[in-house]
C-alpha cells in the first residue's frame, strides 16, 4: 500500500521475507482483520499457502495446491502497440532496477459481499475488510512479480475510493467482463484521475477474466483489466487468475499450445511454447480438458512471458510500459548463465541438459530449463512427437540445480509417458532456454542462455538386456546389450559409451562398470560388491547427452560384507559417544560416520573409522563426536567396501544434547536512537556478538564481539544509524546462534 493508504488503515500490515536456511525460499505475509495469510515460494515442496480457517480461534491451514475453478480468459480486439516477442535467443538479463507501478484496484459490490458477509467466517462489509482482502491478493501477486520480473505493484493512496460495498450503487456490470473494461477505465479516470495511477483493475464475482494487452501506462486503456470468479479468494484466484490477467496488461500473451477445452480459440501462435494446457502463469492449467498438464498454475512466468513483459516495460515511449513507473536501483546483479553447447542425438532417446550460472551477489540460484519452440497450429501434446516444430516438453518450477533430464526421470524409470513429456520420433531441432533466478525479494535478478538439441532419423538408442527383473550375485559378470541404431555415424558420432550402475532404483548412478567402451552394442561388466533389490543399468554416450536406462530392477544378493551386532550412541555433555561391534567383516574398508543436527536437512560426514578388511573375529569400535549444540542429533554408519565401493547403512541412533540456555534481552524497547543495553546471561564464559536484521532478513548492523564471563552481564548497546522501524536481533555465542528477538528502533 502507498504510505498514505497504510496510515489510514494501520490494521492491515504486509511483510516480505526470505529464508535464512535456504535463501532461494521467499515469502509474502499479511496480517489483517481477517487473519494471517502467507505464501512461500521456492520451497522444496513447491508453493506453500497459509490461510485462516478460523482466525478468531487461531486456526490456520497450510497446503501446497490451489483450488480449481471454471475459468474463461479472453483478450479484446488487439491493443498491442509492438510485435509480440518470439525470440529463441538469449533474453536480456535484469534485476538491477526495480520498476514500481501505482495500482488502482476497484471492486464491485458483489465482490465486497463475497469477501466479507459471504466469507467463512463472515465479517462485516466495510471498506476496511474489503481492502484487507484486496491487500492479501496484491501482496501475493507483487511477491511473484518482484521475484520474476523486478516489478512492484503499490495500491494508490486513495484506493479506498474505488471500493464499492453495494451492488445496487456501484458503476459496474458485475457479470459482463467486456462491459467492465470500459466501465473501469471511465470510473478510475473520473474518481482517481488519469495521471494518478499507472495500471487499473477491477475485481468482481462474474465475467471471468479479460484484459487489454500492453495496457500499463497507456492513458487510453491502462485501467482495462477485469478478474471475476464466484469465489474471489484463495491462491487459485490470486495466482492463476489475477496474476494472469495483469500479465496481459503488462504485455504477456497466452503460452499454451492446446486447442481443446477453454484453450480452444485462445491460443497465441507466437508464444504457444507450453505443451497442452501449460503450467505457468500465462498458461491455462487445469481448464483444457484432455490436454491438462496439471490442475493449477505454478507461480512463475515462462521465459517467453518474461521476454514479452520485460520488452514492454522497458519501452519508454509515450503510452508504453516504461513511460510511467518509478525506477529504483536495487544493487542486485543478474546471474550470468551458461547453457552449454548444442548436440545432435538419436530420435526417441532420453537426454540430459546441464547448465550453470554465477551470481556476483552470491545469491542462492534456482534454475529452469524450458523449450522455446512453437508451431503454426496447436494440438494434443502426444501428437508433438511427429512434429518438427511443436513444443514437446512442459515447464517445471525452478530447482536448485542446472540439470534437467528429458523426459523426467520418473517417467523413464516407470516406463510411462505423461502429458507434456514427449520424446520426438522425427528429425528436428529443439530450442531450449536455461533461466537462472536469484529470488531476491524487492527485485529479483534473472539471467538466461540458450542452446539447441538436434534429433536425426537414427535411433532410438535403447538397452536391450535386463528389461525384466533379474537377480545376480555381487561381483558377478554380466553382458550388457543395447541397440546402436546408427548412433556411431555422422552427425551423432557417438563412438564410445559409459556403463553405470545404480542401487537406488535409478536415482543416482555412482558405480562405473565401463568408463569408455566402444558403442558396438555389447559389453561384459562386473557388478559391484553391493547388495540391492533396486539396481538399474544406464548406458550413456561419451561426449554427448543421450542415454537409456533398463526397464526393470536388478537384485544383487549375497553374503553381507559386514555383520553389525551392536551400535549405540550416548551423550556426555556436548559430546556424542559412539560404540559399535561387528561379528565378521569381508573386504571392509571402514565406516563413514554421518551426523544430522537439529537444523540439518540431511546427513553429513563427520569422521571415518578404518575397518579390519576381512576377518571372522568380532571387532569393537568407538568414536567421540565433540562440540555438539543443544537438541536431538541423529547418527548412522555408512560401511564402505575396499576399493571405495559403497556398502550398507546402519540403523539410525539419536542423542539428546542438553546445553544450559542462553538468555538475552534488549532494553528499553522501543530503543531510542539505537542506544540502550543488552542483558546477556551465559551458562559458561564465551564471546558474544549481536547482529541486527531488517524485515527481509538482511544484516544491517553488528556489534563488535565481546568476551563475557559466565552469569548475567549488562552490556551497553550502540547501533549505527539505521532507519526507524521493526528489526530482528540475533545473539551468537562463540560463533553459534544462541537466542534472538525483536526490537523497535525510534528516531
Please report, for each region that a protein language model flagged, where it lies by residue.
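Extracellular acidic, Ser/Thr/Pro-rich low-complexity tracts
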Residues: 345, 356-361, 438, 483-490, ...
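Short, surface-exposed loop/turn motifs with a glycine/proline- and acidic-biased composition
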Residues: 610-634, 704-736
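Short, compositionally biased serine/threonine- and acidic-rich segments at solvent-exposed termini, linkers
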Residues: 557-662
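Recognizes extended acidic, P/S/T-rich segments that occur
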Residues: 381-418, 423, 511-515, 590-630
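C-terminal tail/sorting-segment detector
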Residues: 642-660, 678, 702, 716, ...
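N-terminal prosegments of processed precursors
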Residues: 1-52, 179
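Fold-level signature of zinc-dependent metallopeptidase catalytic domains
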Residues: 59-216
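The catalytic-center signature of Zn2+-dependent metalloproteases
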Residues: 156-179, 218-299, 370, 374-380
Amino acid at each position: 500500500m502507498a504510505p498514505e493508504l497504510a496510515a489510514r488503515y494501520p490494521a492491515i500490515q504486509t511483510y516480505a521475507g526470505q529464508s535464512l536456511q535456504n535463501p532461494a525460499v521467499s515469502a509474502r505475509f499479511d496480517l489483517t482483520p481477517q487473519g494471517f495469510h502467507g505464501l512461500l515460494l521456492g520451497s522444496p515442496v513447491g508453493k506453500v499457502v497459509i490461510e485462516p480457517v478460523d482466525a478468531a480461534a487461531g486456526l490456520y491451514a497450510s497446503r501446497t495446491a490451489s483450488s480449481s475453478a471454471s475459468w474463461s480468459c479472453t483478450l479484446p480486439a488487439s491493443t498491442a502497440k509492438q510485435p509480440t516477442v518470439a525470440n529463441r535467443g538469449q533474453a536480456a538479463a535484469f534485476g538491477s532496477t526495480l520498476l514500481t507501478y501505482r495500482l488502482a484496484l476497484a471492486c464491485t459490490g458483489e465482490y465486497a459481499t463475497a469477501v466479507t458477509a459471504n466469507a467463512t467466517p463472515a465479517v462485516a462489509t466495510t471498506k476496511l475488510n474489503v481492502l484487507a482482502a484486496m491487500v492479501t491478493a496484491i501482496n501475493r501477486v507483487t511477491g511473484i512479480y518482484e521475484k520474476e520480473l523486478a516489478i512492484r505493484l503499490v495500491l494508490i493512496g486513495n484506493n479506498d475510493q474505488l471500493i464499492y460495498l453495494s451492488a445496487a450503487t456501484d458503476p459496474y456490470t458485475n457479470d459482463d467482463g467486456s462491459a467492465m473494461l470500459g466501465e473501469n477505465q471511465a470510473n478510475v479516470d473520473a474518481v482517481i484521475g488519469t495521471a494518478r495511477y499507472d495500471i487499473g483493475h477491477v475485481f468482481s464475482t462474474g465475467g471471468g477474466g479479460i484484459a487489454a494487452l500492453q495496457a500499463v501506462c497507456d492513458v487510453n486503456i491502462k485501467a482495462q483489466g477485469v478478474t471475476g470468479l464466484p469465489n474471489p479468494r484463495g491462491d487459485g484466484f490470486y495466482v492463476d487468475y489475477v496474476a494472469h490477467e495483469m500479465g496481459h496488461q503488462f504485455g504477456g500473451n497466452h503460452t499454451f499450445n492446446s486447442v481443446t477445452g477453454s484453450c480452444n480459440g485462445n491460443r497465441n501462435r507466437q508464444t504457444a511454447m507450453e505443451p497442452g494446457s501449460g503450467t505457468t502463469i500465462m498458461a491455462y492449467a487445469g481448464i483444457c480438458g484432455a490436454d491438462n498438464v496439471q490442475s493449477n498454475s505454478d507461480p512463475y512466468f515462462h521465459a517467453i512471458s518474461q521476454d514479452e513483459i520485460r520488452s514492454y516495460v522497458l519501452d519508454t515511449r509515450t503510452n508504453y510500459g516504461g513511460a510511467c513507473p518509478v525506477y529504483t536501483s536495487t544493487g542486485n546483479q543478474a546471474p550470468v548463465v551458461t547453457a552449454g553447447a548444442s548436440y545432435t542425438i538419436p530420435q526417441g532417446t532420453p537426454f540430459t541438459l546441464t547448465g550453470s550460472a554465477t551470481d556476483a551477489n552470491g545469491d542462492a540460484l534456482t534454475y529452469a530449463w524450458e523449450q522455446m519452440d512453437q508451431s503454426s497450429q496447436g494440438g494434443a501434446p502426444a501428437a508433438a512427437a511427429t512434429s518438427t516444430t511443436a513444443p514437446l516438453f512442459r515447464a517445471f518450477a525452478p530447482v536448485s540445480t542446472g540439470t534437467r533430464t528429458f523426459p523426467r526421470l520418473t517417467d523413464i524409470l516407470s516406463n510411462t509417458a505423461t502429458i507434456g513429456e514427449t520424446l520426438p520420433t522425427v528429425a528436428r531441432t529443439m530450442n531450449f532456454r536455461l533461466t537462472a533466478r536469484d529470488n531476491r525479494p524487492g527485485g529479483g535478478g534473472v539471467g538466461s542462455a540458450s542452446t539447441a538439441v538436434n534429433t536425426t532419423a537414427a535411433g532410438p538408442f535403447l538397452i536391450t538386456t535386463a528389461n525384466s527383473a533379474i537377480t545376480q550375485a555381487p561381483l558377478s559378470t554380466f553382458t550388457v546389450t543395447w541397440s546402436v541404431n546408427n548412433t556411431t555415424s555422422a552427425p551423432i558420432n557417438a563412438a564410445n559409451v559409459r556403463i553405470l550402475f545404480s542401487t537406488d532404483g535409478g536415482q543416482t548412478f555412482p558405480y562405473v562398470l565401463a568408463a569408455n567402451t566402444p558403442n558396438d552394442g555389447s559389453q561384459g561388466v562386473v557388478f559391484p560388491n553391493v547388495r540391492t533389490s533396486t539396481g538399474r543399468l544406464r548406458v550413456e554416450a561419451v561426449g554427448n547427452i543421450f542415454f537409456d536406462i533398463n526397464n526393470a530392477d536388478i537384485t544383487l544378493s549375497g553374503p553381507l560384507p559386514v555383520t553389525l551386532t551392536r551400535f549405540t550412541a550416548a551423550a556426555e555433555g556436548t559430546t556424542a559417544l559412539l560404540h559399535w561391534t561387528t561379528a565378521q567383516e569381508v573386504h571392509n574398508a571402514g565406516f563413514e560416520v554421518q551426523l544430522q543436527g537439529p537444523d540439518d536437512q540431511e546427513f553429513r560426514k563427520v569422521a571415518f573409522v578404518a575397518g579390519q578388511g576381512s576377518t571372522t573375529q568380532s571387532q569393537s569400535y568407538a568414536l567421540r563426536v565433540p562440540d555438539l549444540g543443544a537438541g536431538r542429533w541423529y547418527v548412522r554408519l555408512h560401511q564402505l567396501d575396499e576399493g571405495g565401493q559403497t556398502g550398507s547403512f546402519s540403523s539410525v541412533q539419536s542423542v539428546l544434547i542438553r546445553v544450559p540456555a542462553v538468555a538475552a534481552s534488549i532494553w528499553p524497547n522501543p530503543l531510542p536512537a539505537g542506544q540502550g543495553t543488552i542483558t546477556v546471561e551465559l551458562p559458561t564464559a564465551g564471546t558474544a556478538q549481536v547482529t541486527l536484521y531488517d524485515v527481509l532478513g538482511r544484516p544491517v548492523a553488528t556489534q563488535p564481539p565481546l568476551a563475557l564471563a559466565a552469569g548475567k552481564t549488562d552490556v551497553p548497546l550502540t547501533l549505527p544509524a539505521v532507519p526507524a522501524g521493526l528489526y530482528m536481533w540475533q545473539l551468537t555465542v562463540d560463533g553459534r546462534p544462541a537466542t534472538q528477538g525483536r526490537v523497535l528502533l525510534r528516531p
